[in-house]
Structure formats: structure tokens, C-alpha cells
């Protein structure tokens, strides 16, 4: 028996400038990370079937806070600050990167990382750094090659195979799939992945359901 996760009920809880200002380190958190133009906000909105859960900005790099969303009791999604935008001051970039690294390496309830990257410009240095931080902390990673609708089917498959082959050399638990917020491509696969990562936090609900099931009258 499993508990159905209602992603459409996801709602914003709080923002924090760094890990020290986040709520208690408990339950299960899944973090979303990506370059400032990777389509992270659009992906979160598509995942939850909401138009403005995550605010999209026409000024990449503007979001400097860690944003926390509640999916179910004990299940949270964390929207990490976008990284790698050229027009952001170096001092601010360094502060963000320190905050991201600290979160990935020290947050005990972090059980999965989704790294989003534009399928036309995948695996930049900072993308790889995020993945390696997660691998070092034994956190599974789901890479989403976003804006997949921008490529024709053949080019899309070619890029997917190339990146999958590349991550095989990384070690760790790293999966790669294509994704399109516009077309809905890869949304079901993403939800299935998150379901498995959130499962430990929902185990007590499954146990309660089993206890409440009526006994069979069959002899």
C-alpha cells in the first residue's frame, strides 16, 4: 500500500538567507537547483499544477533566498537560489555558492537533489559542482534537461544519451531525464522519482492505514 502525494496542494512556508535560518532539520526535503535561466520556477509550477507557486523572474539571478514549500506532512521541497548568472556581483555569487554548498553538505533531512539545466547548454561547471557535492554527501541526484521542446526528437535523444554516459563516470546515484514545462514532458517521471524519495516520511501514514483496515470475514 502507498500514500498518494498531492503535489497540487504544495504551498509556500518560508524563505531563509542560509541554512541557519531554515526550520528544524527533520522530515524529508528534496532540493531543486539550477542555473538562473534553467527554468526551475517553471518546472516547480508544472510539477504542482500551479501557475505561480514559484515566482518566475525576468531578471535571472534575482532570487537570493532558500524558499521552502510544504508538500505533505513531513515532506518539503526546497527551491535553492539560482546560480551562475553573469551580471551578479562576484561577492554575491560567492555568498550564494557558500550557502548552497553548506546546505547540501550539512542538511540531514535532505534526501534528494534535482538539478535542472537547459538541454541546449548542459553540464556547466557549477552544475557539476552541485552534483559532486550531493554525491559526496551520498544524496541521490535527478538531472532534468529542461526546455526539451526546444530541440527536435533526434537531437533531444542524442543529448540525453550523451549526458547519461557522462554521469556514469561520476559515481553515485545520478539519473538523467528530459523535461519540458511547456509540453509536460517528463513530469510524470519526476513525480514518480519524488514519490520514492518522500516515501520514508510517509511510512507512518501507511502503517496507520494498515492498522485501520477492517479484518476480513472470510473463513
Curated annotation (Swiss-Prot):
It holds the Pfam family MMR_HSR1. Its cofactor is Mg(2+). Mg(2+) binds at residues 41, 63. Transmembrane segments: none annotated. The keyword Ligase does not apply. InterPro entries: G_ENGB_dom, GTP-bd, GTP-bd_ribosome_bio_YsxC, P-loop_NTPase. GTP binds at residues 34-41, 61-65, 79-82, 146-149, 179-181. One of its GO terms (cellular component) is cytosol. GO terms for molecular function: GTP binding; metal ion binding. GO terms for biological process: division septum assembly. Keywords: Cell cycle, Cell division, GTP-binding, Magnesium, Metal-binding, Nucleotide-binding, Septation. Residues 26-200 form the EngB-type G domain. Belongs to the TRAFAC class TrmE-Era-EngA-EngB-Septin-like GTPase superfamily. EngB GTPase family. HAMAP family: GTPase_EngB. Necessary for normal cell division and for the maintenance of normal septation. This is Probable GTP-binding protein EngB. It comes from Vibrio parahaemolyticus serotype O3:K6 (strain RIMD 2210633). The gene is engB.
Amino acid at each position: 500500500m502507498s500514500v498518494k502525494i498531492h503535489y497540487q496542494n504544495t504551498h509556500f512556508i518560508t524563505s531563509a538567507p542560509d541554512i541557519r535560518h531554515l526550520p528544524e532539520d527533520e522530515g524529508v526535503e528534496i532540493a531543486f537547483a539550477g542555473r538562473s535561466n534553467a527554468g526551475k520556477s517553471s518546472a516547480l509550477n508544472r510539477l504542482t499544477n500551479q501557475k505561480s507557486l514559484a515566482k518566475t523572474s525576468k531578471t535571472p539571478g534575482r532570487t537570493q533566498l532558500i524558499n521552502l514549500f510544504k508538500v505533505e506532512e513531513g515532506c518539503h521541497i526546497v527551491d535553492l537560489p539560482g546560480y551562475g548568472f553573469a551580471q551578479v556581483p562576484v561577492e554575491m555569487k560567492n555568498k550564494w555558492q557558500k550557502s548552497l554548498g553548506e546546505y547540501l553538505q550539512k542538511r540531514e533531512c535532505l534526501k534528494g537533489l534535482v538539478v535542472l539545466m537547459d538541454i541546449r547548454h548542459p553540464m556547466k561547471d557549477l552544475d557539476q559542482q552541485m552534483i559532486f557535492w550531493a554525491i559526496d554527501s551520498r544524496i541521490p541526484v535527478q538531472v532534468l534537461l529542461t526546455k526539451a521542446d526546444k530541440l527536435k526528437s533526434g537531437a533531444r535523444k542524442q543529448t540525453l544519451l550523451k549526458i547519461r554516459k557522462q554521469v556514469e563516470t561520476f559515481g553515485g546515484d545520478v539519473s538523467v531525464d528530459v523535461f519540458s514545462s511547456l509540453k509536460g514532458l517528463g513530469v510524470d517521471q519526476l513525480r514518480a522519482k519524488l514519490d520514492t524519495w518522500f516515501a520514508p516520511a510517509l511510512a507512518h501514514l501507511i502503517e496507520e492505514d494498515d492498522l485501520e483496515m477492517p479484518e476480513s470475514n472470510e473463513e
